[in-house]
Amino acid sequence: MTPIAITPVAPVDIIYDLKHTERATESSPVTLLDVFSRAVSQYPDHELSFITSSAHDSTVHTKTFAEFNQHVHALAQAMRAWGKPTGSVIVVYLTEHEDNMAAVWASLLAGYVPCLQPALSAQQAHKEGHVGHIKNLFSSATWLTNESGAEQVQSISGLDIHLLSELKASAEAGVDFQAHQPNPDDEAILFLTSGSTGFSKAVVHTHRTILAACHAKGESYGLTSESKIMNWVGFDHVAGSLEMHIAPLLYGASQLHVHASAILSDPLRFLHLIEEKSIQLAFAPNFLLAKLTRDLEKRSDLFGKFDLSSIKRINSGGEAVVSSTAQAFARTLQNLAKDGDASFVISAGFGMTETCAGCIYDPINVLETPPSYEFLELGTPVAGCEMRIVNPEDGVTPRPDGESGELQVRGPMVFVRYYNNPEATSSSFVEGGWYRTGDVGIVEQGKMRLSGRIKDTVIVHGVSYGIPELETYLQTVEGVTHSFLAAAPYRAPGQETEGFVVFYSPTFDLDSEDAPAKLFATHRALRDVSVKLITLPPQQIIPIPINQMEKTTLGKLSRARLVNLLKQGELAKHIDRAEELVSIARGASFVAPSTETEKTLAGIYAGIFNLSVSDMSASENFFELGGTSIDVIRLKREGESAFDLPEIPTIQILKHPVISSLAKYVDSLISKDASQEEYDPIVPLQLTGNKTPIFMVHPGVGEVLIFVNLAKYFQNERPFYALRARGFEPGHPFFTTMDEMVSCYAAAVKRTQPHGPYAIAGYSYGGVVAFEVAKRLEAMGDEVKFTGLINIPPNIADRMHEIDWTGGMLNLSYFLGLVSKQDANDLAPSMRPLTRKEQLEIVWKLSPPERLVELQLTPEKLDHWVDIAGSLIECGKTYEPGSSVSVLDVFYAIPLRGSKEDWLNKQLKPWAGYSRAEPSYTDVPGQHYTLMDFDHVPGFQKIFRSRLEARGL
């Protein structure tokens, strides 16, 4: 068959052949500022809407195009006052879509070049290395960020840091402003690559490349001024900023931008927003399609309840889309839709930062046209883009139709160069302007599909992680022969998302008597390291004798060769042997579910974690399987439905995470023989590992669910216990004094761990309680090697006196995500004259219905919860820190009020007077109420664990 290169059908010249440099006409903008001004003048009342990252503010914030225009012009005028030369690079490091969007447009209007910075690493060395690299790359270092971002980079010298809050404060609306007039080939926006295989490169996109891409995307999507799109991809990603903002803006389409955490923590919200906002175009990567399907396909109570008639197309990218997943998702949508005959188009796509996001698409109705392959085809190029498959060895020899090879693309939407990196630019292109994507693909009958990657990365939920770095950490695991380990990206047949496989040679004989125990321990350690580094365990871990692990002449293991052996079945005997040994090791503790309740729970556990029911032992622990706080809610709901129970209290799931134990509790509910349990503050969230346990005291709301996601990072390292306040269960009285609470908690800690050394910490209000418990343990003659205080000062009495019932109720409501921060601050004066019932009714009406369902709240439960929080406030009103402990570790985040610097120096540094050794003060990402949320807990756990290790624990 003849080699081929695929070009789009009937490309429209005006879309990509923008060779003129004169100012734009109304019909053909040639710069991004032309796009912006035309959208504002033609569609001033169209809207940009936003939902923030805060779990405590679910409201939709909206600006019309005209209002947004005034806002960014004022910011641009204020930016001009910085006195930077035209063309200066501004590193934009912000969290929210609206802030990022405003910063980018203000930079362009002021004549600067914005560079969008993704979230920085929580590891100090990585962060400092990256920021230093960026500073050298741009030969300057102007950063526009928020208070949290400034704190993260303050240790790096030579940065010119500007706060967005200060920029907003200095901006004057209505001031005459002459916007910069760029040329089409000027640098427009810089995007940073993931840096998964080294330091990030800065991808240069000009006005011309971005406009070419956006015209082609809009034509492919069928965008018009009446379109409504929804995006939840971060603005620092090309899909979030170019594909889902600038392309729709080019056509005047209204937009809704939702922070990813609002969707990932509540996938059902994706459908609610489509219905409420009449969304026509949305984006959902494969892992979200799979998660939505798993969460919703069994929700028969929701079938026929959603009006999804508006949605015309759902784009999916970032990783290959499994055909069966796409079909199951479309079928689930069909079940949920009021119109049972509704059809849904899912468009898998291919794109990269270097191609302005998607440049190859295949929009199909997967139910009407069943896919032919395991993964959805990626289709054909957009207008102006070409693709071809070549021999990856020489990078130029075309491969015949149907034969795999290196995917290359070219066209006007492909990036111009890597900033200040001519070597990387040169190596990325071959003769004829073809860009080497690093992906392996196949083209058949004009349509492309991917079959792998040349680059050493693995994609987890759309984020690339470097394989070499992962291997470095895996090599340190006991039981692994040094330099005889390789990890490789892999997607098993039928697997929903991409994963990876670990190949290694064990240091022990697989035929020895103790091989089962050693292999089990090694594989568990490899899994734990992987989860902590990239949040994903290996799909398979394959031990191969060292004499069968061939190395190249350079002394390296070939990942490609090992993956090919796996695919060809050549490693089957090693896999079978490993499974046999692991089965022997597990057999000692495996207990088959025996009662009907145990069997039902085993099925629910298996469904949540996508495991085989036959593998579920009655001794399985929910949290050791990887259960999160969201999974707890799912277990609660499915359990209540399966057993026809009005309620399974969340705390009982936390206290009975093992199938057999939870089954006994459920049986007692079914027989209505659930006697009142004696109060025990200890909630075991994680029981594996041999290191010193950690005891974590509840915040001021009394509950401990917030610690579930943190606890899983300590699996097989150390037990993790939470302490929950008294008063949640009927018949349990509130604490009345701090001394009573501390005495109860100290006794519970001693019952759980009779002898030291101890490690205890507390979040917010719980910090002072943890401090007092540590003092009590030391008074008993025990050693406390770690006392962690998370964002709490030593002197809290004055603050406790400030909080009345209304203030406490609003604080709790904000913490639970029922009201916004602004509402919590603004409502108190008008609510205080009202009765408690009237105040609760106001909060209830403001609360998102899905959040109330998730928390299983009723007005009565909320009222009682306010009283519990109030009892803790009362205990703190007379609190005095008093004497000291041996050592303190203070963790600080952005405070509720004031600057982070003042918070540290004026409020937290006084802890030094209550520590016999110099305390440590450690900065953690996030704000007071968000530092352990979905986005921040991966970074927080690394920092927290490093302090435990620093204390010899």
Curated annotation (Swiss-Prot):
It holds the Pfam family PP-binding. It comes from the Eukaryota. The modification O-(pantetheine 4'-phosphoryl)serine is found at residue 629. An L-tyrosine:2-oxoglutarate aminotransferase (probably invD) and atromentin synthetase invA5 catalyze consecutive steps to turn over L-tyrosine into atromentin, which represents the generic precursor molecule for the entire terphenylquinone and pulvinic acid family of pigments, which are widely distributed secondary metabolites in homobasidiomycetes. The first step catalyzed by the aminotransferase converts L-tyrosine in to 4-hydroxyphenylpyruvate (4-HPP). Residues 592-670 form the Carrier domain. PROSITE patterns: AMP_BINDING, CARRIER. GO terms for biological process: biosynthetic process. The keyword DNA-binding does not apply. Gene3D superfamilies: 3.30.300.30, ACP-like, alpha/beta hydrolase, N-terminal domain of ligase-like. Belongs to the ATP-dependent AMP-binding enzyme family. Residues 693-795 are annotated as: Thioesterase (TE) domain. This is Atromentin synthetase invA5. Pathway: Secondary metabolite biosynthesis. Its EC number is 2.3.1.-. It comes from Paxillus involutus (Naked brimcap). Residues 37-460 are annotated as: Adenylation (A) domain. Optimum temperature is 25 degrees Celsius. Optimum pH is 7.4. One of its GO terms (molecular function) is transferase activity. Residues 597-667 are annotated as: Thiolation and peptide carrier (T) domain. Keywords: Phosphopantetheine, Phosphoprotein, Transferase.
